[in-house]
From Swiss-Prot:
UniProt-listed InterPro entries: Ribosomal_uL4, Ribosomal_uL4-like, Ribosomal_uL4_dom_sf
One GO cellular component term noted in the UniProt record for this chain: ribonucleoprotein complex
Region entry Disordered, spans: 48-87
Keyword match Manganese: no
Gene3D superfamilies: 3.40.1370.10
GO biological process terms, semicolon-separated: translation
Species, as recorded: Limosilactobacillus reuteri (strain DSM 20016)
Lineage of the species this protein comes from: Bacteria, Bacillati, Bacillota, Bacilli, Lactobacillales
Gene Ontology molecular function terms on file: rRNA binding; structural constituent of ribosome
Protein name as catalogued: Large ribosomal subunit protein uL4
Function: One of the primary rRNA binding proteins, this protein initially binds near the 5'-end of the 23S rRNA. It is important during the early stages of 50S assembly. It makes multiple contacts with different domains of the 23S rRNA in the assembled 50S subunit and ribosome.
Subunit structure: Part of the 50S ribosomal subunit.
Alphabetized UniProt keyword annotations: Ribonucleoprotein, Ribosomal protein, RNA-binding, rRNA-binding
Length: 207
């Protein structure tokens, strides 16, 4: 099993912790990660774009001129697509961009991304993040103690409310619970800081 250093809040090492190879020892699959990111980004699209076709544009109910005898091309409505102010042909309509991937493929993508973080030494496990009260400065000090200055995904349990409140105002930190870990926020952040209890929950879900 892969092992990584276990740290305290003050940055000192507190032994090591074993990582489940079924989650953190997977050979990274870039194609699966790419597909999973595309799927999640597609699901974030609003899809509310719309234009008016010739049936939705106001006016145009009267034939602009008679069918024959004017020398001009025959027309049935001034809201036909060829007219200024006419309806749009084949324009976008409201739709959902969501599509599905098999559950095992989605899990493999997250496992691949997490395994890559471990290989890059960008996976930091903390014994606990205990705060008496929500203090952004105190959490920033903890990040400094851990030598983490990059854009970071902080994973804490539901019980670590003060830690979550302390970190949420930091520009370079994104705070989630184990249930909120997804392929997009794992890949989008350079480092992951996770508590030991949150690590157990992540392994329980993905293993």
């Amino acid at each position: 099993m892969t092992s990584v250093n276990l740290y305290k809040q003050d940055g000192s090492q507190n032994g090591t912790v074993e990582l489940n190879d079924a989650v953190f020892g997977v050979e990274p699959n870039e194609n699966v990660v790419f597909d999973a990111i595309l799927r999640q980004r597609a699901s974030l699209r609003q899809g509310t774009h719309a234009v008016k076709n010739r049936s939705a544009v106001s006016g145009g109910g009267k034939k602009p001129w008679r069918q024959k005898g004017t020398g001009r091309a025959r027309q049935g409505s001034i809201r036909s697509p060829q007219f200024r102010g006419g309806g749009i042909v084949f324009g976008p309509t409201p739709r959902s961009y969501k599509y599905s991937l098999p559950r095992k493929v989605r899990q493999l993508a997250i496992k691949s991304a997490l395994s890559q973080k471990v290989l890059d030494n960008s996976f930091v496990v903390v014994d606990a993040l205990n705060f008496d009260a929500p203090k952004t400065k105190e959490f920033a000090d903890v990040m400094g103690n851990l030598n983490v200055a990059e854009k970071t995904l902080v994973v804490v349990t539901d019980d670590d409310k003060n830690a979550a409140l302390s970190a949420r105002n930091l520009a370079n930190a994104t705070v989630v619970t184990p249930a909120g870990v997804n392929i997009l926020n794992v890949v989008d952040n350079q480092k992951i800081v996770i508590t030991k209890s949150a690590l157990s929950q992540v392994e329980e879900v993905l293993a």
